[in-house]
Amino acid sequence: MADNSSDYRALFLNDVPMMDARAPVEFSKGAFPGVINLPLMNDIERQKVGTCYKQHGQDAAIQLGHQLVCGQVKDERVNAWVEFAKANPDGYLYCFRGGLRSQTVQRWLKDAGVDYPRIIGGYKAMRTFLLDTLHEAVSECDIVVLGGMTSTGKTEVLTQLRNSLDLEGIANHRGSSFGKRATGQPAQIDFENRLAIDLLKKRAAGIEQFVVEDESRLVGSCNVPLELHQTMQGCPMVWLEDSFENRVERILDDYVINLCAEFITVKGEEQGFGLFAERLLQSLNNIHKRLGGERHQRLSGLMQTALEEQQRSGTVDLHRGWIEGLLGEYYDPMYAYQREHKAARIEFAGNQVDVLDYLRERSDKR
């Protein structure tokens, strides 16, 4: 058996398999990528033990825990832990602080003939390590902000750069009012943990300059860490440009064709299309106050007609009507205003090829 570990850096850099022994309610609030939740106690058991601890102390709480997790319940949980340990012989287990729960799991595994290491300090220590990692990266690294009008292909640029931070990818959201995906977003803590691990791995590979898309503080329901977002507001910018026609086609691909396919993959043909249509109409409705009543009504009518035609014949051509209106009348004026106020920070502007070349050269000079 490997020794119990507090080398959090190595654990995350090497994607070491980890078993989380916390209760499901704790796990759902925040965990680490790829970790499996195999709890010592379920939510109700944990609550009862916690109440007992407050009222009668640690010894009584431990005794109650053993009463609640015994017999067949205990056997089933130990069997699940044994299966995990055998499938992941190089892994580790942990609880919240690396205390009684993980030590109990470790002891019961040993009773079952399996020696398995735990992480010293548990979830709390690893979470602290990742927050420190994020702080150090923001403080020590150079950051370049990639801006541009809606749907100029900023994500396409980021995915071609080894030194990018794809906040929208980590948040599973495209960033705009229309950015929700067919699958949900991670919890806030999960978002922060994934971002910190991405930074940790890239810095370990020698990257000290990062390109990040110009985002508002909120990416859907995920908050960009305040320190990072505040730093981004003063960083140099590169502005990505593309034609109006190309941007219309990109929106058609991303927010109609691909989003519809996502919903159908997740929910099935009939239910998937209905949920896709509902999502699209709701996204437009979310900005109806900013659009104004008449404009919202007109664009909503165009969208509804396009959705009906898409469902009837499979063609998506009519969607270009509301896309062109939304870009030309709403998004472009808003982004033009923003660019004017950020002009002093823009050190380069160009199309996708030119911007990629510039950012790669800029990174090489670091």
From Swiss-Prot:
Alphabetized GO MF terms: transferase activity, transferring alkyl or aryl (other than methyl) groups; tRNA 2-selenouridine synthase activity
SUPFAM superfamilies membership: Rhodanese/Cell cycle control phosphatase
GO biological process: tRNA wobble uridine modification
Catalytic activity: 5-methylaminomethyl-2-thiouridine(34) in tRNA + selenophosphate + (2E)-geranyl diphosphate + H2O + H(+) = 5-methylaminomethyl-2-selenouridine(34) in tRNA + (2E)-thiogeraniol + phosphate + diphosphate; 5-methylaminomethyl-2-thiouridine(34) in tRNA + (2E)-geranyl diphosphate = 5-methylaminomethyl-S-(2E)-geranyl-thiouridine(34) in tRNA + diphosphate; 5-methylaminomethyl-S-(2E)-geranyl-thiouridine(34) in tRNA + selenophosphate + H(+) = 5-methylaminomethyl-2-(Se-phospho)selenouridine(34) in tRNA + (2E)-thiogeraniol; 5-methylaminomethyl-2-(Se-phospho)selenouridine(34) in tRNA + H2O = 5-methylaminomethyl-2-selenouridine(34) in tRNA + phosphate
Top-rank EC class of the record's enzyme: transferase
EC number: 2.9.1.3
Disulfide bonds: none
Active-site residues per Swiss-Prot or TrEMBL entry: 95 (s-selanylcysteine intermediate)
Superkingdom of this protein's organism: Bacteria
SMART domains: RHOD (SM00450)
Domain (Rhodanese) ranges: 12-135
CDD domains: RHOD_YbbB
Keywords tagged on the record: Selenium, Transferase
Database matches in InterPro entries: Rhodanese-like_dom, Rhodanese-like_dom_sf, SelU
HAMAP family with a match to the protein in the record: tRNA_sel_U_synth
Family to which this protein belongs: Belongs to the SelU family.
Quaternary organization: Monomer.
Function in brief: Involved in the post-transcriptional modification of the uridine at the wobble position (U34) of tRNA(Lys), tRNA(Glu) and tRNA(Gln). Catalyzes the conversion of 2-thiouridine (S2U-RNA) to 2-selenouridine (Se2U-RNA). Acts in a two-step process involving geranylation of 2-thiouridine (S2U) to S-geranyl-2-thiouridine (geS2U) and subsequent selenation of the latter derivative to 2-selenouridine (Se2U) in the tRNA chain.
Record's protein name: tRNA 2-selenouridine synthase
